[in-house]
Amino acid sequence: MFGLQHIWDCILQYEAQLRSPFFPVLFSITVYLSFCLPFVLLDALSPKVELIRRYKIQQKASVSWTMMWSCLALSLYNHVVYIFPLSVLHWYWRPVSYLAEAPGVLRVVWDLAACLLLFDFQYFVWHLLHHKVPWLYRTFHKVHHKYTSTFALATEYSGAWETLSLGFFAAVNPMLLGVHPMTEMLFHMLNMWLSVEDHCGYDLPWATHRLMPFGLYGGAPHHDVHHQKFKSNYAPYFTHWDKLFGTLHFE
């Protein structure tokens, strides 16, 4: 409790900046690119370094700078054209309020798990529908499947509808569950990290799916199969929904 309170007190020193309508967009872009950067370096080095290349899921696939810039440009475009205006509307309609007291550690862990599990379910339903209904796939989701070999900067390579609808789930869940603002920030960071890791294209020894037991979590190999085959592994993170609906495949 003391540690979290100290961190939260430090964050609240910048409360004026946190209340700015620019903050959500800058926070999202900064965190996202920070998480992508290590994998961009791996992509740049893997053709020359066998030690890195051995962890690449699709050994023969390569990532060009043109592909990276294309993905980065679309991500920045979506943030500026769509996310920022919505951030301004949210700032006007529902001003952010910050509690002085930090949450307890156990409460943070519980709320993070709840937000993540709820998002995982919402994403699964959304994703399944956008693959099973041809019009939805062609109109909205096909752009995300331009690349059949995943890489980190392809995480946010998507059209306006996909960006906004999945962003809506991520934004509304902390409000629905009534979590602390600190937990909400942590959830957005965790959600972005897991999404980038899903698309990174590497099966690293310390990856989340290797740390979580009993095959509960799919990770990068799980999502890479989805980008190759299109008709399986619809849940973004956990495997229980795909197991239940018979859509879980390992290769």
UniProtKB/Swiss-Prot annotation:
Motif mapping: Histidine box-2: 141-145
Membrane topology: Multi-pass membrane protein
Residues spanned by motif Histidine box-3: 222-228
Entry annotated with the keyword Transmembrane: yes
GO terms (BP aspect): B cell chemotaxis; cholesterol metabolic process; defense response to virus; sterol biosynthetic process
Record bears the keyword Membrane: yes
GO MF annotations, alphabetized: C-4 methylsterol oxidase activity; cholesterol 25-hydroxylase activity; iron ion binding; steroid hydroxylase activity
EC numbers, comma separated: 1.14.99.38
Transmembrane segments: 22-42, 69-89, 108-128
Catalytic activity: cholesterol + AH2 + O2 = 25-hydroxycholesterol + A + H2O; cholesterol + NADPH + O2 + H(+) = 25-hydroxycholesterol + NADP(+) + H2O
PANTHER family linked to this entry: STEROL DESATURASE
Name of the protein in question: Cholesterol 25-hydroxylase-like protein
The organism's taxonomic lineage, starting at the top: Eukaryota, Metazoa, Chordata, Craniata, Vertebrata
